[in-house]
Amino acid sequence: MSQSGSVLRRNGFTFKQFFVAHDRCAMKVGTDGILLGAWAPVADVKRILDIGTGSGLLALMLAQRTDDNVPIDAVELDAGAAMQAQENVAHSPWPHRITVHTDDIQRWAPRQTVRFDLIISNPPYYEPGVECATPQREQARYTATLDHQTLLAIAADCITEDGFFCVVLPEQIGNAFTQQALNMGWHLRLRTDVAENEARLPHRVLLAFSPQAGECFSDRLVIRGSDQHYSESYTALTQAFYLFMWGVNGERIDGPDSASCCG
């Protein structure tokens, strides 16, 4: 991103309240994860599950957004990424709330005796095909180790009756994921289509499903205005995390604690 709202270091990102190192993770901190972590509904949440936590970004963002008594379980298959997530959590303000599990979610989930009000995932979405540079990156990007039907089934087994399961996906894949979820008995409750600017078609979609039927709220989020500054809606959604941003009028937007950062 140009005019990045977080401070980019060679090995990670510094946000307002925490630092995310990602040099040992196949998938780096990016706009998709930041959008999902800032967007997911957290009202009245009592327990959170992050499937495929990677660097721990989503778990850390949700810890910042929720009460201090809300525990977060973050499951990661890759041992290197899980270790880095554990280190990021240990250096954050919430080491007592976030537990990183180095495990396959397909093995971990059946052992759980509690259910989760919020389940969140930035899942792999490419079908197996062209090889990636490393097995770790292939695991993070491709659905071979966790296909969408399996992910939806695991979430269904772990969620509370009125909980939300939230994902971010490319637009077309998100549409197919939604149909698959509906066929499995999920109900789409929130949908935000994300476009880079007003002139472009949406390229990402944020989705929230629930076992419970109800009205579906849909909207559109544009990241940048015609002047290439962040839009008002994107700024409102993410400014609790970014150290600074540039608003629609070109002003720098600082948070109250932007001078103090972790890492």
UniProtKB/Swiss-Prot annotation:
- Name assigned to this protein: tRNA1(Val) (adenine(37)-N6)-methyltransferase
Which SUPFAM superfamilies would you find in this protein's record?
S-adenosyl-L-methionine-dependent methyltransferases
Concerning NCBIfam families, the annotation shows: tRm6a37MtseTrmN
Q: Which gene encodes it?
A: yfiC
The broad enzyme category this protein falls into is: transferase
Q: Which domain of life is it from?
A: Bacteria
Compartments (UniProt record): Cytoplasm
Report the principal subcellular site: cytoplasm
Organism of provenance:
Salmonella choleraesuis (strain SC-B67)
Q: One biological process GO term for this chain?
A: tRNA processing
Gene Ontology cellular component list: cytoplasm
Q: Which Pfam families match?
A: MTS
Membership in a protein family: Belongs to the methyltransferase superfamily. tRNA (adenine-N(6)-)-methyltransferase family.
Entry keywords, A to Z: Cytoplasm, Methyltransferase, S-adenosyl-L-methionine, Transferase, tRNA processing
Reaction catalysis annotation: adenosine(37) in tRNA1(Val) + S-adenosyl-L-methionine = N(6)-methyladenosine(37) in tRNA1(Val) + S-adenosyl-L-homocysteine + H(+)
